[in-house]
Amino acid sequence: MPGRGRCPDCGSTELVEDSHYSQSQLVCSDCGCVVTEGVLTTTFSDEGNLREVTYSRSTGENEQVSRSQQRGLRRVRDLCRVLQLPPTFEDTAVAYYQQAYRHSGIRAARLQKKEVLVGCCVLITCRQHNWPLTMGAICTLLYADLDVFSSTYMQIVKLLGLDVPSLCLAELVKTYCSSFKLFQASPSVPAKYVEDKEKMLSRTMQLVELANETWLVTGRHPLPVITAATFLAWQSLQPADRLSCSLARFCKLANVDLPYPASSRLQELLAVLLRMAEQLAWLRVLRLDKRSVVKHIGDLLQHRQSLVRSAFRDGTAEVETREKEPPGWGQGQGEGEVGNNSLGLPQGKRPASPALLLPPCMLKSPKRICPVPPVSTVTGDENISDSEIEQYLRTPQEVRDFQRAQAARQAATSVPNPP
């Protein structure tokens, strides 16, 4: 369509808009002279004088990116490339960073929180795509504090309204165990400590699933549990040569860091395995301990479902049955059974009932016991003693009235009753 204005070369008024790729141009239809370029961003197309639009009236003012945001976007891209994430992950993480930066609470936050925001956006993207990446790994790369990172992570998820799935343990086990330097012989790893990768992954996964079924994973960091499960799986495949190796030496041979709670998770896993071993007759007579039970982990995992059910979950039914029994019923029969049992218990002692399957936080008492407040039975109708009444007297007149009343009471009690 012809536009307003004149061509500066020939003076023609036949000006038309011609789109050249993504940029609109105003061209003279008579001589072909390009009158102006970028009509949508630099000029008003409906004005005859074709004045340039000032920056304050253009859309560029609202699209200005601060230096802090530019630096954050570069760090997001750099972190994705260091982790060798796919390009789609990088685009998603950048989009989350831009959305989070629009909130005033994030823009006005301190520098430490803005640096942590980079890792939070990358972690959210990895979780949504089921990519095995832990919060601790990102904190190590960014030299960030774990508490600050976790609080910022929860804040960003809430601000953006994102649906972030939980971490997939199976993928994390595969990724974490693949970093262990125990699958080929080297000068630092003796030949007796080298193990097949597939066998070790399979048994580690079974032990992690057992820990998940027995409440050892809930509410805890996954890496200590996986480290303890990997150590037990590695020991159980060749127990004769590896029982003497400690958890700290194992982590040193594998060239991985030893998480602080890993030793506690190891003891909890061994306690669960011992309870399961008590349900097998051929293992009950061996009097296993936490060291020797490692040799029979393969048998215990083979019958894992039934052993866990009989070792823990049947304990509730047994307790309820004993509560329903009369106090004196079965005493003679119980003593006869105890005297002939194969467990070697003292006379008059019965075998302990299976423990309930509860989280460790419910089985262990808290470190600081909260004092129980005393039960108050004050109703407000109690008699007030004389010493307590004096605390409520304020003026001299009240003191004199109270003294007169007290004297009258004593005089009335001293008068003898008439016959």
Curated annotation (Swiss-Prot):
Induction: Down-regulated by epigallocatechin gallate (EGCG) treatment. Its main location: nucleus. Keywords: Activator, Metal-binding, Nucleus, Oxidation, Phosphoprotein, Repeat, Stress response, Transcription, Transcription regulation, Zinc, Zinc-finger. GO terms for cellular component: nucleoplasm; nucleus; transcription factor TFIIIB complex; transcription preinitiation complex. It is found in: Nucleus. Transmembrane segments: none annotated. Zn(2+) binds at residues 7, 10, 28, 31. Residues 314-326 have a biased composition (Basic and acidic residues). The modification Phosphoserine is found at residue 353. One of its GO terms (biological process) is transcription preinitiation complex assembly. GO terms for molecular function: RNA polymerase II general transcription initiation factor activity; RNA polymerase III type 3 promoter sequence-specific DNA binding; TBP-class protein binding; zinc ion binding. InterPro entries: BRF2-like_C, Cyclin-like_sf, TFIIB, Znf_TFIIB. The modification Cysteine sulfenic acid (-SOH) is found at residue 361. In response to oxidative stress, Cys-361 is reversibly oxidized to cysteine sulfenic acid. Oxidation of Cys-361 impairs formation of a ternary complex with TBP and DNA and down-regulates expression of target genes in response to oxidative stress. Residues 314-351 are annotated as: Disordered. Residues 365-419 are annotated as: Required for interaction with TBP and formation of a ternary complex with DNA and TBP. Residues 357-363 are annotated as: Required for the formation of a ternary complex with DNA and TBP. Changing residue 361 to D: Impairs formation of a ternary complex with DNA and TBP. SUPFAM superfamilies: Cyclin-like, Zinc beta-ribbon. It holds the Pfam family BRF2-like_C_cyclin_rpt. Sequence repeats lie at residues 72-157, 173-249. A zinc finger (TFIIB-type) spans 2-36. Belongs to the TFIIB family. Component of TFIIIB complexes. The TFIIIB complex has two activities, alpha and beta. The TFIIIB-alpha activity complex is composed of TBP, BDP1, and a complex containing both BRF2 and at least four stably associated proteins; this complex inhibits the transcription by pol III via its phosphorylation by CK2; YY1 facilitates the TFIIIB-alpha complex formation. Interacts with TBP; this interaction promotes recruitment of BRF2 to TATA box-containing promoters. General activator of RNA polymerase III transcription. Factor exclusively required for RNA polymerase III transcription of genes with promoter elements upstream of the initiation sites. Contributes to the regulation of gene expression; functions as activator in the absence of oxidative stress. Down-regulates expression of target genes in response to oxidative stress. Overexpression protects cells against apoptosis in response to oxidative stress. This is Transcription factor IIIB 50 kDa subunit. It comes from Homo sapiens. The gene is BRF2.
